[in-house]
Regions:
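Flavin-dependent oxidoreductase catalytic cores
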Residues: 1-158
């Protein structure tokens, strides 16, 4: 789907054509109870393009979007790979892309990247910045991560 990498000249070179066909055929195979999600690069190559792609993907009938980073152009050497990343945003630029994309779609959005503490994940969900947060390395490296995540937060059952 990336304009940086997909150089095909046929219909599969069109932005999101392959994704559209994949979504259509998957929806054909399963009933309406099947939740269909899609992991997307939020920077294709910039956040504005990711927002545009998210809206198109939503129109194809997806149930949930999982926003990560796109595969960068090897010539793209910046550490933060989007323009206009606010300096006061307390978390990673990849999480920020998910937060921004959520503002433009109606389906749930999952964010990911460098969530080290359960309080970070809770802050994102409790402030309606994201619907879900994917956590990987922190759960492996911190044996008490899940236990700490069970602490009382405003959205959790008491």
């Amino acid at each position: 789907n990336s304009k940086l990498w997909n150089k095909r000249k046929d219909k599969y070179g069109e932005r999101l054509y392959f994704s559209k066909k994949l979504i259509e055929n998957t929806k054909y195979l399963f009933d309406d109870n099947f939740i269909l999600g899609y992991r997307m690069g939020g920077n294709e190559p910039e956040l504005e393009n990711g927002i545009e792609n998210a809206k198109i993907l939503e129109s194809y009938g997806l149930d949930i979007l999982h926003v990560s980073s796109g595969v960068p152009n090897p010539e793209y050497k910046r550490q933060v790979k989007i323009n206009n990343f606010p300096k006061d945003f307390p978390l990673d630029w990849i999480i920020y892309m998910g937060v921004e994309i959520k503002k433009h779609v109606k389906i749930p959005v999952i964010g990911v990247s460098k969530i080290k503490k359960e309080s970070q994940a809770s802050w994102l969900v409790e402030n309606n910045l994201l619907d879900f947060v994917a956590v990987g390395k922190a759960m492996i490296s911190q044996d008490k991560w899940m236990e700490n995540a069970k602490k009382d937060f405003s959205l959790r059952k008491k």
